[in-house]
């Protein structure tokens, strides 16, 4: 019975991978990483603050990473996610994907709400959403923060994308 169950589960996952898509309830793991059916998925075309990165609001340090993760939790709680893979998994097994929830782009919503920034080196799809969030001073844009890519460079942190 266990073998049958495992075989069925592997067949379902293989079908999803072959179709370049993964579906199911999502859980926020980090500010731009979700987990679906045990598979970690990095959101394509966007970037966000990192651990040890300070943000300020009204001259005081605030927990911007926790706020970004919480916003992603709110978004993924709205329904199951469908993610279209954008290449092979990285060295940690994470997929890079465009995801939707209720037919809305999760990637774009996180940027539009100001808790992620566009990553134009991957796609320009989210540049307008970032500009709108910045202009409206929502999310991270309410205060000051270093762009995540610049923070990683300054801190000597290398994050490989698939």
Give short role names for the model-derived ranges.
Residues 5, 16-162:
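Small beta-barrel nucleic-acid-binding modules, primarily SNase/OB-fold domains
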Residues 1-8:
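Sec-dependent signal peptide recognition
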């Amino acid at each position: 019975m266990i073998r049958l169950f495992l075989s069925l589960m592997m067949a379902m996952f293989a079908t999803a991978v072959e179709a370049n898509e993964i579906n199911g309830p999502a859980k926020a793991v980090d500010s731009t990483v979700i987990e679906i059916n045990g598979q970690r998925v990095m959101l394509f075309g966007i970037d966000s603050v990192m651990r040890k990165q300070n943000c300020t609001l009204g001259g005081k340090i605030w927990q911007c990473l926790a706020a970004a993760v919480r916003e992603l939790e709110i978004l993924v709680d709205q329904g199951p996610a469908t993610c279209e893979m954008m290449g092979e998994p990285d060295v940690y097994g994470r997929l890079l994907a465009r995801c939707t929830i209720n037919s809305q782009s999760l990637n774009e919503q996180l940027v539009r709400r100001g808790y992620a920034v566009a990553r134009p080196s991957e796609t320009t799809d989210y540049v307008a959403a970032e500009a709108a969030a910045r202009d409206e001073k929502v999310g991270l844009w309410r205060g000051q923060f270093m762009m995540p890519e610049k923070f990683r460079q300054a801190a000597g942190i290398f994050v490989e994308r698939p």
